[in-house]
Amino acid sequence: MNLKETELCLGLPGGTETVESPAKSGVGNKRGFSETVDLKLNLQSNKQGHVDLNTNGAPKEKTFLKDPSKPPAKAQVVGWPPVRNYRKNVMANQKSGEAEEAMSSGGGTVAFVKVSMDGAPYLRKVDLKMYTSYKDLSDALAKMFSSFTMGSYGAQGMIDFMNESKVMDLLNSSEYVPSYEDKDGDWMLVGDVPWPMFVESCKRLRIMKGSEAIGLAPRAMEKFKNRS
């Protein structure tokens, strides 16, 4: 008697289907499970590889940008350098260049000297470079000191020191006469030398009384003769 025929099994009455043995069914189950696991692993590895490709590119780009040996080219910022500072520098350079040209040519120098007058409680300062002759200087001093009047000069605006009588007449007729201190420290009468030489040698001016200036006349005439 076949024992398989008498075995109890689950199923519909009259069914002829046989149930596979647990060993056979287990082998099939294991094979199906391994296939599904391998498929999932393959899918995951493909996804990771795709992500790695994308993620590996980004750090390389960042490291390239952060590389100190190869800084990226920077475009000049609009409005740099500041316009105000740039203009100041340009103007300063222009002024310094103009000043150097003026000093080299000698036309931009100034010759400020102090002017005092006997009896006046104040001092003045004049720029001799602003005037072109003794006549211009005389008019300017007359405006500064109302009581000052300068005597008449020759055609060149100079006192005729060759004629002693004319010098004495000038000093006696004028209440005040201008005098100046030269580079040697001597006080001389204004008008003893040509105007350009006077501008270069004058250190300060003093308007003194004619009676006091008479003592300067012999010294001025002697120095004038030595220069001539």
Curated annotation (Swiss-Prot):
Pfam families recorded for this chain? Answer: AUX_IAA
Query: Where in this protein would one find the motif EAR-like (transcriptional repression), according to its record?
Result: 8-12
Quote the cellular component terms of the Gene Ontology held in the record. Answer: nucleus
Entry-linked SUPFAM superfamilies: CAD & PB1 domains (SSF54277)
Q: What induces it?
A: By auxin.
The keyword Transcription belongs to this UniProt entry's keyword annotation? yes
Q: Which tissues carry this protein?
A: Preferentially expressed in roots and flowers.
Q: Which GO terms describe its biological process?
A: auxin-activated signaling pathway; lateral root morphogenesis; negative regulation of DNA-templated transcription; response to auxin
Record's keyword terms, sorted: Auxin signaling pathway, Nucleus, Repressor, Transcription, Transcription regulation
- Which Gene3D superfamilies does the UniProt record give? Phosphatidylinositol 3-kinase Catalytic Subunit, Chain A, domain 1
Going by the entry's taxonomy, the superkingdom of the source organism is recorded as Eukaryota
The listed locations are:
Nucleus
For this protein, the record's PROSITE patterns field holds: PB1 (PS51745)
Q: Which GO terms describe its molecular function?
A: DNA-binding transcription factor activity; transcription cis-regulatory region binding
Q: Where is the PB1 domain?
A: 110-210
Mutagenesis / variant outcome for changing residue 82 to S: In slr1-1; gain of function. Affects auxin-related developmental processes
Q: Domain note for this entry?
A: The N-terminal half of the protein contains two conserved domains I and II. Domain I includes a slightly degenerated ERF-associated amphiphilic repression (EAR) motif which seems to be involved in the activity of transcriptional repression. Domain II is required for the correct degradation of the protein through the SCF-mediated ubiquitin-proteasome pathway. Interactions between Aux/IAA proteins and auxin response factors (ARFs) occur through their C-terminal dimerization domains III and IV.
Q: Which family does it belong to?
A: Belongs to the Aux/IAA family.
The protein's job, in short, is:
Aux/IAA proteins are short-lived transcriptional factors that function as repressors of early auxin response genes at low auxin concentrations. Repression is thought to result from the interaction with auxin response factors (ARFs), proteins that bind to the auxin-responsive promoter element (AuxRE). Formation of heterodimers with ARF proteins may alter their ability to modulate early auxin response genes expression.
Summarize the subunit comment: Homodimers and heterodimers. Interacts with TPL.
- Tell me what this protein is called: Auxin-responsive protein IAA14
